Amino acid sequence: MNHVVIIASAQFGYHIDTYYYCKHLKHRCNVTYIGWNQGLSPVILDGIEVISVSRKGGLIRVLRLLNAIWRQTTNKNSVVFIKYFKFLSWFFRMMRPRNPMVLDIRTGSVETSSVLRFLYDTVLKIEALFFKHITVISGGLSEKLGLRNTRLLPLGAETISPADKVFDTCRMLYVGTLYNRRIETLIHGLADYHAQADTHDKKIFLTIVGDGSPGQLDGLIAIAAEQGLNDIAVFTGRVPHDQLKPIFDTHNVGISYIPLTPFFDHQPPTKTFEYLMSGMPVIATRTSANQLVITSENGVLIGDTAAEVCRGIKTMLQKPDRFSSEQIRQSCRDYEWPKIVDNLYTYLCNLK
């Protein structure tokens, strides 16, 4: 395989999985990434041809996207890797029937409306019928969607912070989307702990990195202020992935808070792995995916209520010396990105 074209709806660098595919494939073959230009700060990765397609113009933008894909896939030996592109994935397949092509599914629908979830998951399953080769993030997701003959392409992680952590305080970090995640429950749980703790025990801090739908971040900031957490909870908004290291360096506990719902249950959370690879124990909600990786040696599993968040913080602070950054990193070595992309490269080379 000499050339792979990766197609995704996200602007380059803002979808973690495809970013690391590019990073670790570029030393083995030519890599082209095609995605929307969403007006975010550009992420630069040497050795990658990035084509950012303008989203202006309604139907015209779709034609621009199709034109970019057509131009980059003229060689029938170019492998096309599509991170599921809602409503268009099937058309990409029809455009280039002779090219080896993979449909990669990272998630089912996480819409709050059951009707919309059913609709979008049905569309996904119909589009998947056009593909011979399909990769999925987890076996649970493949089973949930009723997909057969899929190849597992699990979530990976890279060490963002190599520093060994000191656990004299609890400097918690949540990184991820705020959309549909009920982060207000996390804030209420922190407030409950703060209200119960003795004055001398209030060595807790929480940084929330990410954004959601319009007005959502401001709403969470207001909730934190109402709870008297102005000196404890900090909101940074969105931070590009390649600028996260200083934040990870200064925190020692990761928060993987995902509501306990059927549509999130089999969704492996990116940040759980990144916290662990950075030597941070994790307070994680008890999803099926988190239960596969979180143990008493690298974190604590909780429910998704404020009381459970409070309990998780208490548990984390009771015996902080039981955690070792090196042991925590060792617990998830199988999920390192280089290993995962090695397997992906072998898979892509054998496509027909």
Descriptions of predicted regions:
Residues 51, 121-163, 174-180, 233:
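Donor nucleotide-sugar binding/catalytic pocket of nucleotide-sugar-dependent glycosyltransferases
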Residues 12, 181, 242-244, 254-274, ...:
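Nucleotide-sugar-dependent
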Residues 205-220, 237-238:
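Glycosyltransferase donor-sugar binding loop
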Residues 296-307, 315-321:
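Conserved acidic donor-binding segment of nucleotide-sugar-dependent glycosyltransferases
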Residues 304, 318-351:
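A charged, aromatic-enriched C-terminal amphipathic alpha-helix characteristic of glycosyltransferases
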Residues 5-7, 135, 163-190, 207:
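Conserved donor-binding/catalytic core segment of Leloir-type glycosyltransferases
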Residues 81-88, 105-106:
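Short His-centered aromatic/hydrophobic patch
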Residues 23, 66-70, 90, 103, ...:
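Membrane-proximal helix-turn-helix segments that form the acceptor-binding/catalytic region
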